[in-house]
Structure formats: structure tokens, C-alpha cells
A protein has these predicted regions:
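Generic secondary-structure boundary/loop-capping signal
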Residues: 28, 108-114, 257, 264, ...
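Conserved beta-strand -> loop -> alpha-helix junction used to position metal-binding or nucleic-acid-contacting
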Residues: 84-141
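Charged, low-complexity, helix-prone segments enriched in Lys/Glu/Asp/Gln
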Residues: 1-16, 117, 121-133, 159, ...
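Acidic/histidine-rich catalytic cores and adjacent linkers
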Residues: 35, 76, 83, 87-95, ...
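Short alpha-helix boundary/capping motifs
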Residues: 69, 125-129, 145, 299-302
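Juxtamembrane helix-loop transition sites at the ends of transmembrane segments
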Residues: 50, 64, 131-136, 289, ...
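RNase H-like nuclease fold core
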Residues: 1-103, 123, 266
């Protein structure tokens, strides 16, 4: 089946079959491809793309609202309800979602929020390294001859080693789970630098915010205490302003709904597959070609289970024939 026929089927039989098993939870995202933009909606529990639209310009609120209203109309025709929607931290979505779906729970992708926070923590660690390197004494040329010069040389070497260790093991400040050996390494490289140990403690508290065992209200109370702690952390607190972003509260919405996914991995996976397809399948990138290729990809994914069953049946038949 060609791309044009695949596009026609996606709007008809494919959507009917996909919505027969609709979970009620979706993920929405935009993919930029040169002058074009692909808007996608994916079932966030079955990981199945439901609909898409290819634009020849960067989307605005009107484009997003029109796209969502088209999908909402498809749900209403089938008497289906949307239970929750997950997006990234883009400003494109909050207003159109409110206009189209009302007060439906809107979850911001946990990974996108944590990514920004880990970048802030790493930036704070880099600031400490720069401050530490600035304390390195200036040495005269040649070998140190006096006792004072030798003492300064030893101090400079210790500082260089400390800065190097902090740079080499900087990932320990943001890694989610540390092994006992990694914790010992972290204690060693942060010896004499209490602000760095506080930095790691802040990151631990950030990860605890997303613990499914607590409710959103409890997580918000934890967040308020954490923000108070950061405000008192005068030395490098200014580099952690991401903790005060309103997106952080929106990323905790999933805690009140066990079925609401905390990430938009479902739609991100489809975007990655599209990027890979571009590199290996075709080079002509026009609006119509992109739309056709995505339709073919959706059709191929729909038939993946049937292909697997056919392959397994053939393998079993060959095995019996060989026996």
C-alpha cells in the first residue's frame, strides 16, 4: 500500500481500531523537521500513535488548539473520555489544552523537568570548581627552592587534584541511585566541601518528590521545604533557580492518578523512530512525503503483532519439517 492510501486509512479504519482499545491517557508532542513541524498524539499506555498533522511552519496556540479539537471530536463521536494528557514543558500546550479539554489532568514529562534540574546542579558544581581553582596560589617559574615556595607548590598540587576529582566524578552529584562504592567516592571527593554534600542532598530530595508512594499534596509540601532549604543555601542557591519553576509542580500531577504516566516516552519514541527513518529510508523531505512516510510507519507498527505471529508459525513449521 502506498503512502496516499496509507494516509486515507489512518484517518478511517486505523483510528477506529486504535480507539477501540483507548486507555484514556495521551501524550502530545511536536517534532521539528527543517521548515516543517509534525504534531503527534500517542496513547500513553499502549504506545500507539493515534493521529498526527504535518505543518509547513512553526506551530502556535491556534495550530495546537485546532489539532486537539480534531482529536476531541473523534473521541466524542465514539463517546470516549480523556482522563489525562502528558506533554513536555513547552508553552504551546497549557492554554489550548484548557480551552479544548477543560480541567483534564495535565502532566509535564518528569524526565524533561529532572533534566533541567540536573543541569542546574551540575552548573552549581562547576561554580564550586571554579571558585576552588581560583584559590590556587601562583607559582614562580622553575623548581621551588625556599620552604615557602615548596609549601605553595604542594598546596597548588592538592587543589589541582581536588578540582580534577570533582570534575571526573561530577556525575555522582546527579545519578539517581549510588552504589556503596560510589557513595564512598563521593564522600572522599567532597571532604572539606560541605556545600557539595548539601548539593547532593538536594538532588536526593528532588528524586524523592517523584516517589509514587506519596500524593501530590505531600510532594508539594516536600517541595516547599526543599525550596526553603535552597533559599538558605546562599553560596550557590542562585544557580538552582530551576527549583522555583512552576513546571515542577505540574510534573507532580501524576501522583494522584496511578494510571497517568509521568513521562511522554510514548510520543518521544515515535519521534526517535522518525529521525532514524529519515536517515536510512529517504532523502526527499517535502510536506506530503513526510505525511506519507509517517502513515506507512503507523501502518507497519499496527501489523507488527501479526508479523510476529506469522514468523513464529513459520519457524514452528520448519522445525517440525526438519524433525
Amino acid at each position: 500500500m502506498g503512502g496516499k492510501k496509507a494516509e486515507q486509512r489512518i484517518r478511517g479504519d486505523y483510528l477506529d481500531a486504535a480507539l477501540d482499545n483507548f486507555s484514556g491517557y495521551i501524550a502530545a508532542d511536536e517534532l521539528y523537521d527543517g521548515p516543517f513541524c509534525v504534531l503527534s498524539i500517542v496513547d500513553n499506555r499502549t504506545f500507539r500513535r493515534l493521529t498526527y498533522e504535518v505543518l509547513d511552519h512553526d506551530p502556535d496556540h491556534a495550530d495546537i488548539e485546532r489539532f486537539l479539537r480534531t482529536f476531541q471530536a473523534s473521541l466524542q463521536r465514539r463517546e470516549l473520555l480523556l482522563q489525562g494528557i502528558t506533554t513536555d514543558g513547552s508553552n504551546l500546550y497549557p492554554e489550548p489544552i484548557l480551552q479544548v479539554f477543560g480541567n483534564v489532568p495535565h502532566q509535564l514529562c518528569e524526565f524533561h523537568v529532572i533534566k533541567e534540574l540536573t543541569k542546574a546542579v551540575l552548573h552549581a558544581g562547576a561554580k564550586v570548581r571554579r571558585e576552588l581553582a581560583a584559590t590556587r596560589p601562583k607559582l614562580s617559574r622553575g623548581r621551588p627552592s625556599s620552604a615557602t615556595a615548596r609549601k605553595a607548590a604542594r598546596q597548588a598540587k592538592r587543589i589541582e587534584q581536588k578540582v580534577g576529582d570533582l570534575f571526573e566524578h561530577r556525575y555522582l552529584f546527579v545519578q539517581h541511585v549510588l552504589t556503596p562504592a560510589q557513595r564512598r567516592t563521593l564522600l572522599r571527593v567532597t571532604r572539606g566541601r560541605p556545600e557539595l554534600r548539601t548539593l547532593r542532598g538536594i538532588m536526593d530530595e528532588v528524586y524523592r518528590l517523584f516517589d509514587r508512594r506519596c500524593r501530590t499534596d505531600t510532594a508539594l509540601e516536600k517541595l516547599a521545604r526543599l525550596r526553603g532549604r535552597v533559599r538558605r543555601f546562599k553560596r550557590i542557591g542562585k544557580t538552582l533557580q530551576k527549583l522555583f519553576s512552576p513546571n515542577l509542580e505540574k510534573a507532580l500531577t501524576f501522583l494522584d492518578d496511578k494510571l497517568l504516566p509521568s513521562t511522554s516516552n510514548a510520543v518521544e519514541r515515535g519521534n526517535r523512530r522518525h529521525r532514524k527513518m529519515q536517515k536510512t529510508v529517504y532523502r526527499v523531505r517535502t510536506r506530503s512525503h513526510i505525511a506519507s512516510r509517517i502513515a506507512l510507519d503507523m501502518q507497519r507498527e499496527e501489523r507488527a503483532t501479526q508479523r510476529l505471529l506469522t514468523t513464529q508459525a513459520l519457524h514452528c513449521a520448519r522445525g517440525r519439517a526438519a524433525a
